[in-house]
């Protein structure tokens, strides 16, 4: 029983309603992604490959579920283990500067080292732009989650290591960017 003797109105949600809510969710996410890209452009991000990565990689899958409604806002958000995902502007800026600093064209045989896998979002961006990404994370649970998400997108060009980033990855050095 629900309030004052009324039956709970939502014991079973019809499939049509579930489908409609998923469609609405997709439309909202696409709209928020487009708005985020405009914010990044307004803040000076110009590299079209970087903007395309930010636009297509589903950031909402990399954050804590309680914050999913804020996934495409330009701010850091909690992920797990007291850590946060960087705000999209920082991800875009670091990636844009890395591309400029390594003098690489997208698609060249380049390899980069990422210190701190975290959520795996930055890793996914790098994996779409570089041939090889070596990513170090000190918190095993974060590394395993990031690896699982990124492999589900077919990003097989990432090598993960559970270690302290201060130690680097000497057996794979040198890197074209860090």
Model feature map: region roles:
Residues 12-13, 20-21, 119:
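Composition-driven detection of intrinsically disordered, low-complexity segments
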